[in-house]
């Protein structure tokens, strides 16, 4: 019902503006709100609506956006790209200046802040890099004002703008060798809690396995099945569409309620078995495309980056480091251009 109304309103807006304006909606939170009552389980219908030009969502609120993991996408980003839809991310990135707008306990939860400048800086770097490297649009959402009213943050946003503008002349295509597949309808039939355990929680482990991945709805599998070396299927319950994929490709890794506590090392082991290049053999957030690489450390120590043969990096943001020689502190981010 929700998807149908979005398509109807989008068509109405297009007609009334004589197709001069782009039209979009906040919708498709397949990973973030897997509960069957969330009304976010007909994304494929919206992706096939010609009147919808873009879709939006915030960055996941997982674990109050703390350090040490990739703040994941709420939706299967690469299905949007495949269907010609722009993804427009709402970067409502809190800072140490963020204060509750009202004296209501709900707004005092930790999600409304990092409590210090250091964590703010690292979150801003992470949130910019995810958009730059995954090649989508975003805006900094200063929700009720004053969040970025600090010289360091304003300088960072100015620096990011320059990098983003320069990136428009570069190839930001995916180099991922892993695809994550989900059937949004599985969330409608799964037992209570299984959607969260499989589709929501697993994103945290996927994000630190040391190699990038793309994400798709299962309806797009046939079109992309020859593009990737490894497939990870998120199955809170096994639907006919997922079963069809597994029959055709029994080498998929299937994550179910029974094995959803899978570790990052187990994910790396699977990737190795499929010939996937691991940029890190230890837990790390690694975003990579054809022109940029971003590293967010999860632990203290050497970076242990393993680059494909012939690849060289030039650091363009973050405290200057020699990643081949220098031990890095945990929870810090470094952005590089690939030469």
Q: In which residue ranges do the predicted regions lie?
A:
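Short, catalytically relevant binding-site loops at active-site mouths
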Residues: 30-31, 261
């Amino acid at each position: 019902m929700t998807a149908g109304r979005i398509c109807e309103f989008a068509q109405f807006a297009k007609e009334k503006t004589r197709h001069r304006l782009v039209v979009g909606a906040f919708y498709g939170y397949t990973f973030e709100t897997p509960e069957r009552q969330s009304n976010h389980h007909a994304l494929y219908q919206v992706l096939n609506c010609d009147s919808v030009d873009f879709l939006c969502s915030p960055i996941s609120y997982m674990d109050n956006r703390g350090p040490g993991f990739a703040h994941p996408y709420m939706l299967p980003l690469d299905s949007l790209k495949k269907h010609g839809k722009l993804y427009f991310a709402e970067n409502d990135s809190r800072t140490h200046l963020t204060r509750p707008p009202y004296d209501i306990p709900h707004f005092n939860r930790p999600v409304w802040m990092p409590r210090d400048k250091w964590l703010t800086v690292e979150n801003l770097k992470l949130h910019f890099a995810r958009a730059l490297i995954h090649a989508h649009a975003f805006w900094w959402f200063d929700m009720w004002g004053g969040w970025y009213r600090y010289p360091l943050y304003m300088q960072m946003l100015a620096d990011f703008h320059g990098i983003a503008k320069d990136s428009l002349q570069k190839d930001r295509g995916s180099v991922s060798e892993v695809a994550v597949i989900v059937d949004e309808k599985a969330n409608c039939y799964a037992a209570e809690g299984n959607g969260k355990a499989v589709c929501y929680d697993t994103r945290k482990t996927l994000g630190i396995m040391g190699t990038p991945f793309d994400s798709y709805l299962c309806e797009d599998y046939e079109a992309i099945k020859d593009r990737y070396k490894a497939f990870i299927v998120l199955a809170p319950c096994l639907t006919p569409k997922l079963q069809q994929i597994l029959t055709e490709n029994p080498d998929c890794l299937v994550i179910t309620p029974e094995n959803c506590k899978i570790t990052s090392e187990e994910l790396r082991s699977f990737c190795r078995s499929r010939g996937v290049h691991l940029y890190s053999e230890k837990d790390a957030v690694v975003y990579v495309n054809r022109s940029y690489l971003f590293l967010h450390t999860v632990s203290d120590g050497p970076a242990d980056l393993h680059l494909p043969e012939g690849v060289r990096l030039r650091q363009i943001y973050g405290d200057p480091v020699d990643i081949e020689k220098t031990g890095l502190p945990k929870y810090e981010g470094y952005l590089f251009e690939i030469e």
